[in-house]
């Protein structure tokens, strides 16, 4: 419904001036009508979901102290993460790699795994600890109506605020489906920050008993880990980290990047990036689209706080990183 509403509103804005002209409505009245409609859309956006942008920040809401960065701590984090990434691949099994790069479909191999049930159960266990809305059984993911268009601007999922629907791109690969589902569900449960949504998606998927879901969690975090490592480490240190990753995972990662790059349109993508960057900055996310990669800082802060060892209802695999 959200997709139809947005498209319908845009079409109305384009068509209404011609309708008003034919009905001999004055320009002032026409503009006034459009402004009033947009005002109500604006109000609807915030009352339906947008007020989540004004929640207390993660550290203030959870009482967790923000970790001070140090090269040694980051190296420890990377060592633990790469070890768990490799382990999750081993437990998932080499045979899975054949369909990880297939598009997710309701009839494909990944559909036999109860992704929605596992992830919603995980969120239910940690909702109170992190100030999330506990997921209801009525929640259902919606497919994007224009997935091919969204792929051209690198959008794999989004939260539809007007009807509080979370939507997934129908061109998602099986390897990324569980993590992306968990990320968008986090938005549906009241989390506006992209870094936080990544954090909870990672915690839920990497704690799952199902090997394919667990690997999806570690694998989907790899891009953010790589980006931070390139920025914070020397080239020699960076290459040393990459060498520790199983070659099968590196190959899968490169194939995954190629899959989306072939669909991406640089011109359209840049416009979407600038618009969404401005949108985030205008809604209390000062770092804009860079907020996605800030998930690494949240994870390192959780490690220092030792949240994983104080009676957490989920046995988060991050314990091994401490």
Description of each model-found segment:
Residues 97-164, 170, 174:
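Auxiliary, metal-adjacent structural segments of Zn-dependent hydrolase domains
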